Every structure is written in structure tokens, then in C-alpha cells.
Design a protein with these regions (language model features):
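Conserved loop->alpha-helix
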Residues: 1-114
Length: 114
């Protein structure tokens, strides 16, 4: 049997990100992907994100971009190796992350007003 890795994805695209930079090292690649500020609360280091339909783990995050680290296996079984700097990619935020973040925000706002 084949193991299915990654997180559950729905195919709902939240935004289109742009590849700001690609760092190549040996047989791996780091993609640095820009994102709109309104999604900053949902893009967390070691969290999950969908990039062009592929479930990936988020690396470092800064105010305007996040990193994903692509290992040889990922590069060989996806089309992510064909991406270039400046390429647009479809981004799906992990639904569990969105739900947890929104729940915490709602609880905190209720506590502040109550």
C-alpha cells in the first residue's frame, strides 16, 4: 500500500502567491513565496499550506513571505521543480489552522468585550 502524506486539502484557492526567490542547495530547493497581509495570521512556521495543490510544511515566515523546503522526492513527483522566480502559484491555507485562529480570535474578542 502507498502512504498518503500531508494534510487534507479541499482545492479552495485562497490567493495567488508569487515566487520571490528560489534558493537551490545540492538537490533541494527553498521557495520563498509572497503573500497578502490579510493572510499573515494563518501562515505559521511548521504549519501546513497547499502550493499548486501540493501539501507542504511552512518553513520560516516573515511579514511578506514564507519559505517551503522542497526535498528531492517532492521535486521528482510534482511539477514544483519547474517553477521560476516570478512564477505565480495557487495557495490554499490549511482549513484547520484557519478554524483554530478564528476561534481563538473570537474567544479573545468576547473576553475583551465581556
Amino acid at each position: 500500500s502507498t502512504e498518503i502524506g500531508g494534510h487534507l486539502m479541499s482545492g479552495h484557492i485562497h490567493f495567488t502567491g508569487k515566487i520571490k526567490k528560489i534558493n537551490k542547495k545540492d538537490n533541494t530547493k527553498d521557495l520563498i513565496i509572497g503573500f497578502p497581509k490579510k493572510y499573515k495570521d494563518y501562515i505559521l512556521e511548521k504549519g501546513y499550506i497547499g502550493v499548486n495543490g501540493c501539501s507542504l510544511t511552512i518553513g520560516k515566515v516573515n511579514k511578506e513571505a514564507f519559505y517551503v523546503h522542497l526535498i528531492p522526492e517532492t521535486l521528482s513527483v510534482t511539477n514544483l521543480d519547474m517553477l521560476k522566480e516570478g512564477s505565480n502559484v495557487n495557495i490554499e491555507i490549511d482549513q484547520n489552522t484557519m478554524t483554530i485562529v478564528e476561534t481563538v480570535k473570537n474567544i479573545l474578542s468576547t473576553q475583551k468585550s465581556g
